[in-house]
Amino acid sequence: LDQVIEYIKDLHFDENDLAYLKSLNIFDDDFLEYLANFHFSGDIYAIPEGTVIFPREPIIKVVAPIMEAQLVETAILNILNHQCLIATKSARVCYAAKGDGVMEFGLRRAQGPDAGTYGARAAVIGGCTGTSNVLAGQLFDVPVKGTHAHSWIMSFPDEYTAFKKYAELYPSACILLVDTYDTLKSGMPNAIRVFKEMREAGIPLTFYGIRMDSGDLAYLSKKVRKMLDEAGFPDAVISASNDLDEYLIESCLLYTSPSPRDVEES
């Protein structure tokens, strides 16, 4: 909604705009003069951002002379349709996560920089706890968070060295990406080794854990949880990424939830 209001308040036609429109030879001089002096005089009614809405309910109402309303119609629909879509999907995903934090990492797959930036804002409105989009964080004052990439791991001679260096740089927010080579045979043993070294060195393990970005996340998360618990790190965070939607998240949580027998034996 903020973007809609900013657009309408700033809408005007400068000399370059008017010269281009005139060159098309499809508008008469009276219309071009009208555009030169254009100022939106209508009223806009809208529900507050973040309000739950249902299909076929009006989100925004524009009351204005028909010429003014038609000039702003396409832009309003373009802004609202995309961001409502992102906010709605984010809300569904966050609801499926049942209170676990959901991060927005969508910039690289967005339809252009503006879509990625405003999509990040919409995702936070929908319930996401933060974004990897630093520009969105600066513009909209939303939390900026993230981990390291596979390229970080591959830039070092081996996985352990990459993990150790990252832990030195970010000891209070140490989330290690364990699936670059082999999650269970390489990534997890190396991550656990680094966590043990941090603990032995007296470094507080305030926020730490692993991230998985590939494979059968439901199956792997259960295996990973067991490895962390057996190594003495029951409070380590397990985070997942890569094409997660509400259905996959629900499946992962269902698969990894302890059964009554698990609870009895634990």
PLM regions: where:
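N-terminal low-complexity segments that are often proline-rich with Ser/Thr-Pro
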Residues: V263-S266
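Buried, small/hydrophobic-residue-enriched core segments of structured protein domains
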Residues: I26, L32-S41, E49-F54, I59-P234, ...
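Conserved small/polar residues in nucleotide/adenosyl-binding loops
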Residues: Y255-P260
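Intrinsically disordered, low-complexity, positively charged segments
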Residues: L1-K22
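Structured beta-strand/loop patches that form or line metal/cofactor-binding pockets in enzymes
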Residues: I44
